[in-house]
Each structure stands twice: as structure tokens, then as C-alpha cells.
């Protein structure tokens, strides 16, 4: 919630800087984390705002849809393979977050439609994204983006549990194991590139680990609800919570250190990082 407030403050207090940060394919796609977070926390906001928490959910859906439309017009209708990054998952699969908690707002039919859309669009995007990332040169600044491969599974698993009339335990286990494999890959990738220098894309590691932990929470709840839980799985998922906190705190600290450096040095470094990501049009 604090990070959401800071993002809103940046939009109003520094609109030029905000616009500069989202006028590129990577910047705009990563901004999808804002509406995705709104959708995620909307259920938790019920304690503070009662039924008015619906407005958080609707705002998240509307903003995410707007990003999807703008992104499609700018970067799909004018397609260039150099602008294809794993962050596209946040734009096109991000709307699936609303399928996870749609039942809390009586939007079951909408949620099922978005759920199937998320599966369909994720399958379509996997090949071009992986082809672009592994077959073409990738800058150091763009390497953390590969961690966003966790987004589709991290959204589809909890949505499947919440919306499917008959849940297949085998399918759940396959998705859960897939998430664990991606998590291991993300952590290894993060460690290997930890000393490459700080880039804003480091936040992708935190997003990735967090969404794995978020999805695993639903998996654990399902197992416990059907009396299939085990201490090992419980410890693994609790470990993911701790890991999510550590990675998130580390990335936040690195970001603050970067921001608090000399303003001119920071401005120059931001420009250099932007150029490395091929964000300048």
C-alpha cells in the first residue's frame, strides 16, 4: 500500500519524470505492476473501506485495460522484435489478477472469461518472448526481465483454484512444481547478475518471487482444505514468504540508495540505463 501511495505521489508530483519512465515498451509494461497491485489488495481493503473496496478493484481493471490497449496500439500494431520482452506478460496476463478475486465482487462470469483469456494469451506469447530473449543479444539491464516468466503460472494457478468447478489435484501439482522450478531459475539468475550494477529492472526479481509466494499460498490453502497438506510443503511455502520479504527489502534498499545519490549522477545513470534497455525512441 505504501508503494502504491508513493507511485501515485510520483504521478502527480513529477508527471514529466513519470511520462519519461513509461514512454518505452519496457517502462509501460512494468507500470502494469501498479494496477495489478490495486487489484490484489482490493480484497484486503475491505477492512478499511468496507464495500468501497470495489472501487480499488475496478480502478485496477480499468487502468490495466487502458495499458493493454495503449501498448497494443504502440508496440503490436507497429511490431518490432527488438521490443519484445518478458515484461509483456505483465501487460497481457496481468489482467488475470482480476480473475483471482472476482468472486469477492460478484464478477464470476467476467472472471472466467478473463481466466481463459489469460491462459490463451500466455501460451501465444511464450514462444516469441523466449525466442527474442535467448536467440538475440540482450543487454545487462534487460536480463532481470526474464524472471517475469513466473507471471502466467503465478496468476493461472490461484485463478484455477477459485473458478474451476472441479479442480484437478494433479494439474495443481504440475503448476506448483513449475512455479518452484521458475523460482529456482529466478534466484540463480539474480545471484549470477547481482554485481552487474543496479538497474530499475531489478524490481522484476521481487515481483517474480512475490507472485510465486502469492500463488503458493492458494495452493497450500487448497491442500489444507482438502486434508492433503504436509509439513514439508508448508515449510517450503513459508520459506517463500521469507524469501519474498528478503528479496523485496533488498531491491527496495538498492533503489533508495540509487535515488539518494547525487542528483546529477543519478540522472546520468538513469539515462545510461535507459539507453542500455533500448528504450529511447
Q: Model-derived features: where do they sit?
A:
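Helix-coil boundary and interhelical linker segments in multi-pass alpha-helical membrane proteins
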Residues: 44-54, 100-112, 160-171, 219-235
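Aromatic-anchored, glycine/proline-accented short structural segments
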Residues: 117-176
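Structural signature of hydrophobic alpha-helical transmembrane segments
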Residues: 1-5, 50-65, 109-123, 170-181, ...
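Alpha-helical transmembrane segments in multipass membrane proteins, preferentially the mid-helix core
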Residues: 67-71, 100-101, 124-133, 155-164, ...
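An N-terminus-focused feature that recognizes amino-terminal "leader" regions
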Residues: 2-25, 255
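Juxtamembrane helix-loop boundaries in multi-pass membrane proteins
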Residues: 14-42, 57-60, 73-100, 115, ...
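Long, repeat-rich segments with strong aromatic
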Residues: 161-197, 202, 211-219
Amino acid at each position: 500500500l505504501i508503494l502504491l501511495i508513493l507511485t501515485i505521489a510520483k504521478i502527480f508530483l513529477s508527471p514529466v519524470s513519470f511520462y519519461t519512465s513509461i514512454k518505452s515498451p519496457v517502462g509501460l509494461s512494468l507500470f502494469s505492476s501498479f494496477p495489478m497491485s490495486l487489484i490484489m489488495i482490493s480484497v484486503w481493503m475491505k477492512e478499511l473501506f468496507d464495500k468501497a473496496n470495489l472501487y480499488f478493484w475496478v480502478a485496477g481493471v480499468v487502468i490495466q485495460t487502458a495499458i493493454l490497449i495503449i501498448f497494443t496500439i504502440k508496440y503490436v500494431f507497429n511490431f518490432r522484435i527488438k521490443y519484445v520482452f518478458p515484461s509483456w506478460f505483465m501487460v497481457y496476463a496481468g489482467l488475470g489478477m482480476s480473475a483471482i478475486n472476482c468472486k469477492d465482487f460478484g464478477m464470476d462470469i467476467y472472471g472466467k472469461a478473463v481466466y481463459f483469456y489469460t491462459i490463451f494469451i500466455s501460451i501465444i506469447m511464450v514462444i516469441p518472448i523466449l525466442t527474442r530473449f535467448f536467440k538475440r543479444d540482450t543487454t545487462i539491464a534487460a536480463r532481470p526481465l526474464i524472471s517475469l516468466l513466473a507471471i502466467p503460472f503465478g496468476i493461472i494457478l490461484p485463478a484455477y483454484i477459485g473458478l474451476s468447478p472441479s479442480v484437478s489435484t494433479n494439474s495443481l501439482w504440475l503448476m506448483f512444481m513449475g512455479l518452484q522450478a521458475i523460482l529456482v531459475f529466478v534466484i540463480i539468475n539474480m545471484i549470477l547478475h547481482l554485481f552487474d550494477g543496479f538497474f530499475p529492472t531489478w524490481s522484476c526479481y521481487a515481483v517474480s518471487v512475490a507472485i510465486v509466494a502469492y500463488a503458493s499460498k492458494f495452493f497450500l490453502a487448497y491442500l489444507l482444505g482438502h486434508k492433503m497438506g504436509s509439513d514439508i510443503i508448508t515449510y517450503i511455502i513459508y520459506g517463500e514468504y521469507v524469501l519474498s520479504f528478503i528479496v523485496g527489502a533488498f531491491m527496495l534498499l538498492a533503489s533508495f540508495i540509487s535515488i539518494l545519490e547525487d542528483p546529477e549522477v543519478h540522472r546520468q545513470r538513469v539515462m545510461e540505463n535507459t539507453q542500455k534497455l533500448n528504450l529511447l525512441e
